[in-house]
Amino acid sequence: MIMITDSLAVVLQRRDWENPGVTQLNRLAAHPPFASWRNSEEARTDRPSQQLRSLNGEWRFAWFPAPEAVPESWLECDLPEADTVVVPSNWQMHGYDAPIYTNVTYPITVNPPFVPAENPTGCYSLTFNIDESWLQEGQTRIIFDGVNSAFHLWCNGRWVGYGQDSRLPSEFDLSAFLRAGKNRLAVMVLRWSDGSYLEDQDMWRMSGIFRDVSLLHKPSTQISDFHVATHFNDDFSRAVLEAEVQMYGELRDELRVTVSLWQGETQVASGTAPFGGEIIDERGGYADRVTLRLNVENPALWSAEIPNLYRAVVELHTDDGTLIEAEACDVGFREVRIENGLLLLNGKPLLIRGVNRHEHHPLHGQVMDEQTMVQDILLMKQNNFNAVRCSHYPNHPLWYTLCDRFGLYVVDEANIETHGMVPMNRLTDDPRWLPAMSERVTRMVQRDRNHPSVIIWSLGNESGHGANHDALYRWIKSVDPSRPVQYEGGGADTTATDIICPMYARVDEDQPFPAVPKWSIKKWLSLPGETRPLILCEYAHAMGNSLGGFAKYWQAFRQYPRLQGGFVWDWVDQSLIKYDENGNPWSAYGGDFGDTPNDRQFCMNGLVFADRTPHPALTEAKHQQQFFQFRLSGQTIEVTSEYLFRHSDNELLHWSVALDGKPLASGEMPLDVAPQDKQLIELPELPQPESAGQLWLTVHVVQPNATAWSEAGHISAWQQWRLAENLSVTLPAAPHAIPQLTTSETDFCIELGNKRWQFNRQSGFLSQMWIGAEKQLLTPLRDQFTRAPLDNDIGVSEATRIDPNAWVERWKAAGHYQAEAALLQCTADTLADAVLITTAHAWQHQGKTLFISRKTYRIDGSGQMAITVDVEVASDTPHPARIGLTCQLAQVAERVNWLGLGPQENYPDRLTAACFDRWDLPLSDMYTPYVFPSENGLRCGTRELNYGPHQWRGDFQFNISRYSQQQLMETSHRHLLHAEEGTWLNIDGFHMGIGGDDSWSPSVSAEFQLSAGSYHYQLVWCQK
């Protein structure tokens, strides 16, 4: 044990937090989570241990701008200014200091290993009573599961130790410091340390004791570490559980270790041995270790599909059977290996349906509770995810247990990121930083290696490629050869990774960056000498209204076996709740706390909002990742199972046929398909519709029974096909009254019964409609070529930087947002049974014509207004965001009814999950409340739209809400939006894709850009 004076002044003088060679003082060695049961049955059933005591709860807290401002007296007693805070928590969430959101740029001046003199410091203290029996024998430890970023610990005024690495436990022996009765802990937490240079992740920078604190009492002679591994014969019919156990304390001949393996209430195998390890070299073996091997016949294998778990109980006892202590862990029998260019689990090639997940809560910052963790896992499973990357640090220890039990594959990632360094490997190639990096990697492996869910180790994120990475790669491969190692830095295919693991590589497009080219994922596989599997560590940047082009990745994954999936960036929006002057909550992002530097809304890239409400894009991910694939041939549906291990046993296939949303026939049957097999389902003779319309066959896979992660009735997969239809024959219309045209100097007015239409002859726009005396429009019907910019359109996060290549900057520079209409033509003609208005406009900016729009409005005796639009786009202007019409309707109806794709928001490059049907939703549900307002709520493939007294028919896309595109574009946060008068309707003949390969470069695929030059669309507007 290192002993230094208890004086605060001496600790401050040492400045351990500015020394990369000091990562800890007196911290105990890493190991799996312990509970020190004194009853093996309690260990087997995972009951709460009486030897493990939580110190979570109310602690005293005082904040200071720098450690030097902390008074020496604090070591002995609480300060008068101390407040009460809950541990675990981030002190910024209690109003102390400000959270800082930055992506790449360090939040402090870059001068490693030194940190600013103004270094916010939190002083925590807790008084507690200790069980006297704990003082009489054994060892009492204190465990801090997570403290950001570094801390010194005192107990009863005496200095105990120091720790850093905010995402792994720091554990200390308190035995020599405790006394009977009351004891006082004092923890001085520093916001910045040299470790902060290794923690430059894309996240909020917060501080404090943000994970659990607990006391653990161990016997003097104790289990100090244990490691389990599983091995198999070729066909997995026989397995061996290998358990290596290490002890600490007095090594006595009478000591024994028993390892028993349980499957529920049944003991499967057991073995007992004295200490004394196998011979390692010419000097012998470890006297304090023992390895036991248990044979298991026909093991129930673990996978994310079927997470079969056993329970291993490790007992330390004497030769007469007296139990000293027991530890335990869940065991999953599974094998991970790379063979022939494929990542295999239990001999089967995995397809990673993954997502990156930050530990984030809108109210609690980076504090994770079990309820939130379970909620995340259930949502992931329900949306067909099978893997999660712990981006970019080891998670709360409970997370791994939950992933073991519910079934998720985990990439466990070291808490190392130096993204803001120039070059990025400035520290990771420096041997002075090897000890700090080594602690972060080796301790992660030692803590988490017993979890079957952990199938891949990661050396960190965005830290370049340095010699330290190579050293740590070799250490992991030596200590744990049972798992592959991945690391993206330095180009995603260095010698420090077993898996090609690029981020944001595109399917077909190369990005030849200097030094670290990012090839298309298809090309990467075929590079000379390259035989590794490719799994994208990050892809499909889900920032705001995004995930366009997601289907293209999944087409490639299914086409090329060595393209084994990837991890979407990312799971949850990292917005934080703030309160306005009236106490109303609102969602905040970078800069909203006065934090500098900041990257604004770049912290919100989630498939779910911060409160875990799904984004519409989550449904697209669910559909593309579904485990059942379908093909229709005549009356036969071929169902292919992509499950590797699971035979369908809780699935019904429901099919239905509908004509324009009207059901014609339906049925259901059980799915009985083996893993990686097919089932052919013969449908009955389908009815022939008597009228014209869109005829669709829809299949859903429904789970009739609840599972551990889903309720009864859960839909896991679906598909639609448009069937052959009857030809549409238009019968002559019955005679109607003829609309009357009235012409004045300013207007053309058409009247039919109680309806009137008014066209302004100076503007050429439909300026008003009446039904009876009620006006229907608040603004004229106009062309629209722009959208409120998406994050993907903006392309940058820094408030001080503009990317001229971003879509929004190109649109602005070309004048799309400022364009004004110059009237070229506005005429009226009376036909035999209709009135025809013909208009033409040149949309211009600074004398340059960007678009020419020609329209005809044919109003017939039935009251229908048929609108035909032809648009020409100037060859030298950027491709527009949309080609459509917009107006502000006077009505505010409660519901929207449409026949088209839905029910969720969908866009041309993100619509495979949408189904054609007749949908009916509240108006409020037609708006997607992205925290950073943008274009939202589009529904594609629409044949009919009904709202209030109005109906629109044709083939178009629309969105409808209380917010104009102008307001969405000018508003920074959703809570600042105000419902405008009436309802804004946007009807598009064509709409550009939204992109999403990444959010900082134009990522809309060419096929989803409006590049044709000329466009034609038409629709009918009438009253019901």
UniProtKB/Swiss-Prot annotation:
Family statement: Belongs to the glycosyl hydrolase 2 family.
Chain residues that bind Na(+): 202, 602, 605
Segments traversing the membrane: none
Binding positions (Mg(2+) 1): 417, 419, 462
Site (Transition state stabilizer): residue numbering on this chain: 358, 392
UniProt: substrate binding residues: 103, 202, 462, 538-541, 605, 1000
EC numbers, comma separated: 3.2.1.23
Protein name per its UniProtKB record: Beta-galactosidase
MF terms in GO: beta-galactosidase activity; carbohydrate binding; magnesium ion binding
Listed Pfam families: Bgal_small_N, Glyco_hydro_2, Glyco_hydro_2_C, Glyco_hydro_2_N, LacZ_4
Species of provenance: Shigella sonnei (strain Ss046)
Complex and partners: Homotetramer.
Cofactor needs: Mg(2+); Na(+)
UniProt catalytic activity: Hydrolysis of terminal non-reducing beta-D-galactose residues in beta-D-galactosides
GO BP term, pick one: lactose catabolic process
Binding locations of Mg(2+) 2: 598
Keyword Transferase (UniProt): no
Cofactor note text: Binds 2 magnesium ions per monomer.
GO cellular component: beta-galactosidase complex
Alphabetical keyword list: Glycosidase, Hydrolase, Magnesium, Metal-binding, Sodium
Catalytic residues as annotated in Swiss-Prot or TrEMBL: 462, 538
Domain of life: Bacteria
